[in-house]
C-alpha cells in the first residue's frame, strides 16, 4: 500500500535541504498531491535559505571584530522614537551570545508586528545581556532630539550587567571610552544592531500602548506618537499633554 499524501508531507518537513529534496524518492511519485507538496517544501527551503544567507551577511562586522579578538563582547545599539510628536526616545543595547541565530532578524522597520513580537520573545530568552535607555520628553525639548538620543544610548550601555568591549552603533558616534563602529543603516547590516532595533521598537510600542489607555482620544496605541490625522484631531479636541514634545511642530506653534 502506498504512503498517504499526509504522511509524505510530514516526511518532507524533515528534509532540511534542497539537495536532500532532489534525491528524494518522492520525485517519482506521479500523484498531483505529492508533487504539489514537493513544490511547496522547495519554496519553504528556498525562503529559509534566503533568510540564512541574509543572516550570515549581517554577521560580517561582528565576525571581523571576533577575528581580531575572539573574546570580544560586541554590543549593538539602536534607537526608536526620534520622529514622533509624543513620548520618549528609547534605545536598546544588546550583546548576543556567541552561537546566536535568530532566523528572520532584520531592521525592525522591515518586519511585521507579528514577526517583531516573535523575534523579541526569542531575543529576551537568549541574549548575553541587554538594557534599555530612555530620554524623556523634557530632555528632548531641552537638549534636542539628537543629543537626547545619544544620552539614551549612553544610559542603555550603562545599564548592561557587563561592560562591552566594542560597540556597533546605528548612524551615531558616542563620546565613550569603548571602541566603536558607526554604521549607516546599521540595523540592516548588523545582527547586533538589528536585535537592538527590534527590542527598542517593541519596548517603546508597549509604552505608547499603555499611554493610549491612559489618554484615550489620541490613538497612541496606533500611531505610537507620530503625527497622524487621528493624533492631530486628538490634540485639537483634548489639548496638549505633558507627553507631547513642545519643540516639535505643530506642537511648538500651538504652545507659543
Curated annotation (Swiss-Prot):
What does this protein's UniProt record list under function? Endonuclease that specifically degrades the RNA of RNA-DNA hybrids.
Keyword list (alphabetical) reads: Cytoplasm, Endonuclease, Hydrolase, Manganese, Metal-binding, Nuclease
Which InterPro entries does the entry mention?
A: RNase_HII, RNase_HII/HIII, RNase_HII/HIII_dom, RNaseH-like_sf, RNaseH_sf
Q: What class of enzyme is it?
A: hydrolase
**What is one Pfam family matched by this protein?**
RNase_HII
GO BP terms: namely: DNA replication, removal of RNA primer; mismatch repair
Q: Which organism is it from?
A: Staphylococcus saprophyticus subsp. saprophyticus (strain ATCC 15305 / DSM 20229 / NCIMB 8711 / NCTC 7292 / S-41)
Question: Looking at the record's lineage, which domain of life comes first?
Answer: Bacteria
Q: Which SUPFAM superfamilies match?
A: Ribonuclease H-like
MF (Gene Ontology): manganese ion binding; RNA binding; RNA-DNA hybrid ribonuclease activity
Q: Where would you find this protein in the cell?
A: Cytoplasm
Q: Provide the binding site for a divalent metal cation.
A: 78-79, 170
Write down the EC number. Answer: 3.1.26.4
This one is known as Ribonuclease HII
Amino acid at each position: 500500500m502506498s504512503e498517504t499524501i499526509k504522511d509524505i508531507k510530514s516526511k518532507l518537513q524533515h528534509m532540511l535541504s534542497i539537495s536532500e529534496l532532489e534525491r528524494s524518492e518522492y520525485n517519482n511519485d506521479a500523484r498531483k498531491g505529492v508533487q504539489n507538496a514537493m513544490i511547496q517544501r522547495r519554496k519553504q527551503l528556498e525562503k529559509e535559505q534566503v533568510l540564512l544567507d541574509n543572516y550570515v551577511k549581517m554577521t560580517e562586522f561582528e565576525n571581523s571584530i571576533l577575528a581580531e579578538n575572539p573574546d570580544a563582547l560586541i554590543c549593538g545599539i539602536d534607537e526608536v522614537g526620534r520622529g514622533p510628536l509624543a513620548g520618549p526616545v528609547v534605545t536598546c543595547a544588546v550583546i548576543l551570545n556567541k552561537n546566536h541565530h535568530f532566523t528572520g532578524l532584520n531592521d525592525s522597520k522591515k518586519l511585521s508586528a507579528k514577526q517583531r513580537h516573535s523575534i523579541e520573545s526569542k531575543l529576551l530568552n537568549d541574549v548575553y545581556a541587554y538594557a534599555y535607555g530612555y530620554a524623556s520628553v523634557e530632555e528632548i525639548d531641552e537638549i534636542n532630539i539628537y543629543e537626547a538620543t545619544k544620552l539614551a544610548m549612553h544610559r542603555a550601555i550603562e545599564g548592561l550587567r557587563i561592560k562591552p568591549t566594542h560597540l556597533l552603533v546605528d548612524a551615531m558616534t558616542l563620546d565613550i571610552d569603548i571602541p566603536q563602529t558607526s554604521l549607516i543603516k546599521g540595523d540592516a547590516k548588523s545582527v547586533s544592531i538589528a536585535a537592538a532595533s527590534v527590542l527598542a521598537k517593541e519596548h517603546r510600542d508597549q509604552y505608547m500602548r499603555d499611554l493610549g489607555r491612559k489618554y484615550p482620544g489620541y490613538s497612541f496605541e496606533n500611531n505610537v506618537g507620530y503625527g497622524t490625522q487621528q493624533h492631530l484631531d486628538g490634540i485639537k479636541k483634548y489639548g496638549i499633554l505633558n507627553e507631547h514634545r513642545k519643540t516639535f511642530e505643530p506642537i511648538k506653534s500651538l504652545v507659543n
